[in-house]
Swiss-Prot record:
It comes from the Viruses. Plays a role in limiting the replication of viral DNA in keratinocytes. Recruits the host NCoR/SMRT complex to viral replication foci to mediate repression of both viral replication and transcription. Residues 188-198 have a biased composition (Basic and acidic residues). This is Protein E8^E2C. Residues 20-38, 84-106, 119-148 have a biased composition (Low complexity). Keywords: Host nucleus. Residues 1-215 are annotated as: Disordered. The keyword Metal-binding does not apply. Belongs to the papillomaviridae E8^E2C protein family. It is found in: Host nucleus. One of its GO terms (cellular component) is host cell nucleus. The keyword Ion transport does not apply. Pfam families: PPV_E2_C.
Length: 315
């Protein structure tokens, strides 16, 4: 608009384009004055700015560089981003803590419920176990409670066992006492001692079973007497010396395994003289009575030969 006003004012009044209304011609000088007034003001403002610049240069101060402004902007942006991230992390931690707390409270509630249920059911089970003679046992009314019992057994075993063990400890202790009394009773210990071969007596049929003589063992008087009572069995054969020698040679080959050893022929002599008393004799030793019986059943003694059973303390 200012340019239009200047163009209108610069055209002369006698030119064809300059013929205008009287109202416009009267207004033109005011606009020119305004335009002329604005130009010296701008010049004065520019001069003042130049003077301030020269004054600053005189003191030796320099204007701040433009590179520091974006750094402040970057710092502000970083601080804003940090504040945002910290606020976000704080909010996330608060949310996670709230979720953990809610879960822990729910778990505690469920545990408390399971404890109360396990205690009530453990008391019922102990009351059922207390009566062993009772044939009828109550069962759960609904299948849902039966399945829930099985699912909760794993959680309530460790806690329910303590109270069940306290309630049923008296029965278990009584059973243990009965077992201990049965195992450590004097009758059972006597039976075991009676059955042991060390404390057995020697029956008449067992006399003569042992082959070797009793050595110098530190088994005591009783053990020594019992060992001496078991003497090896023997058969004493009486007859002519030649017949006994022939019988011995045949029996060694024919009846192997049915005897232990044969002795040479001998004869008894009286104490006052050197004369032989009776016929010559021979001993046949055995390891046990059964062996002697088997030998006696299998052997055929020659004519004119007599025999008799006996036992010796040692051979």
């Amino acid at each position: 608009m200012k340019l239009k006003m200047l163009l209108l004012s610069s055209t002369p009044p006698g030119s064809p384009g300059g013929q205008t209304d009287p109202d416009t011609s009267s207004k033109t000088p005011t606009t020119t004055t305004a335009a002329t007034d604005t130009s010296p003001r701008r010049q004065s403002i520019n001069k003042q700015s130049q003077q301030t610049e020269t004054k600053r240069r005189g003191y030796g101060r320099r204007p701040s560089s433009r590179t520091r402004r974006p750094q402040t902007h970057q710092r502000r942006s970083r601080s804003r981003s940090r504040s945002r991230s910290s606020s976000q992390t704080h909010s996330s931690t608060t949310t996670t803590t709230t979720t953990y707390r809610s879960r822990s409270t729910s778990l505690n509630k469920t545990r408390a419920r399971s404890r109360s249920r396990s205690t009530s059911r453990s008391t019922s089970t102990t009351s059922r176990r207390g009566g062993r003679g009772s044939s009828t046992r109550q069962r759960s009314r609904s299948p849902s409670t039966y399945t829930s019992k099985r699912s909760r057994e794993g959680n309530t075993r460790g806690r329910g066992r303590g109270r069940q063990g306290r309630a049923g400890s008296s029965g278990g202790r009584e059973q243990r006492r009965r077992r201990r009394s049965f195992s450590t009773s004097p009758d059972s210990s006597k039976r075991v001692r009676r059955e042991s071969p060390k404390y057995r007596g020697v029956s008449p049929s067992e006399v003569g079973k042992q082959l070797r003589s009793v050595g110098a063992k530190h088994s005591g008087r009783l053990g020594r007497l019992l060992e001496e009572a078991r003497d090896p069995p023997v058969i004493l054969v009486r007859g002519d010396a030649n017949t006994l020698k022939c019988f011995r040679n045949r029996a060694r080959n024919k009846y192997r395994g049915l005897f232990r050893s044969f002795s040479t022929t001998f004869s008894w002599v009286a104490g006052d003289s050197i004369e032989r008393l009776g016929r010559s004799r021979m001993l046949i030793s055995f390891s046990c009575l059964t062996q002697r019986r088997d030998f006696d059943d299998a052997v055929k003694y020659p004519k004119g030969v007599e025999w008799s059973y006996g036992s010796l303390d040692s051979l």
